Regions:
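One-carbon transfer enzymes
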Residues: 1-181, 190, 226-229, 235-237
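An anion-binding loop in the catalytic cleft
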Residues: 163-248
């Protein structure tokens, strides 16, 4: 948007694209490209561009169709994901695929770091793919709907950490929601944001959610199969802090 404004390129920001599509179709675009666009594009727009509507989707389709593929890739424990360049159709990320590029999800990746990895490969992949789209030499690959999984937008319920599951699942949930919207747990009737954690090798005969220990290393909490160490958290109304500061503040 900033680049467009700086170069006197018209900017449209329809609140509801289905109701304001004529502003787009009146431009008679040759091609439309979207990335992380949160609305279903109406057929009037899909059928408008000469070379079609292209979407840059942050997963290896048909896996993780939907609005939160980066978050859900980590939360669900995927070890890889990627970028798919695809044609848009009336469905949710169901169109024919044009190109893909894969990235590895490291054990310490967060939603933020994975976003940055995918951003870094998306533009070069798009630029490499565009000429074949324009000259009609690209190969279209149908998606296998039987292999599809979905990554719907993160709900408020999904932000809440239940320790009544494996340490790995808790760890993945916390890093999968970092840096937005953030996972949280309830402590003393307060929603405490959990930003960073690690899996410990210790197992305790304690009810999941029980605080085992709190020291400068972190907040150790029992899980279904062991424990996790919360390293960085945030009290309502305050900035993020490590547990050393939290112990001083508590």
């Amino acid at each position: 948007k900033k680049v467009a404004i700086k170069n006197n390129i018209k900017v449209l920001q329809p609140v509801k694209i289905k109701e304001e599509y004529e502003d787009v179709t009146s431009l008679n675009p040759d091609i439309i490209i979207t990335c992380a666009y949160g609305q279903i594009v109406p057929l009037a727009i899909l059928n408008c561009p000469k070379y079609g509507c292209i979407n840059v989707h942050a997963s290896l389709l048909p896996k993780l169709r939907g609005g939160a593929p980066i978050h859900k890739a980590i939360i669900n424990g995927y070890d890889k994901t990627g970028i798919t360049i695809m044609y848009m159709d009336k469905g949710m990320d169901t169109g024919d695929m044009i190109a893909k590029e894969e990235v590895k999800i490291e054990d310490n990746d967060t939603a933020e770091s994975l976003h940055d990895k995918l951003s870094a490969i998306s533009v070069p992949l798009l630029m490499k793919t565009l000429p074949s789209i324009i000259n009609g030499t690209n190969k279209r690959e149908k998606q296998n709907d039987a292999d599809a999984t979905y990554a719907y937008n993160v709900s408020r319920e999904e932000e809440h950490v239940s320790f009544d599951k494996s340490s790995k699942d808790v760890y993945n949930q916390i890093r999968g929601l970092n840096s937005w919207p953030g996972a949280y747990a309830v402590l003393d009737d307060k929603n405490i944001k959990l930003w960073s954690s690690s899996i410990t090798n210790n197992k305790y005969d304690k009810t999941p959610g029980t605080i085992i220990n709190l020291d400068k290393n972190g907040l150790c909490v029992a899980t279904k199969d062991g424990s996790v160490l919360i390293k960085e958290l945030q009290i309502p109304g305050k900035k993020k802090m490590n547990c050393l500061l939290y112990t001083s503040d508590a």
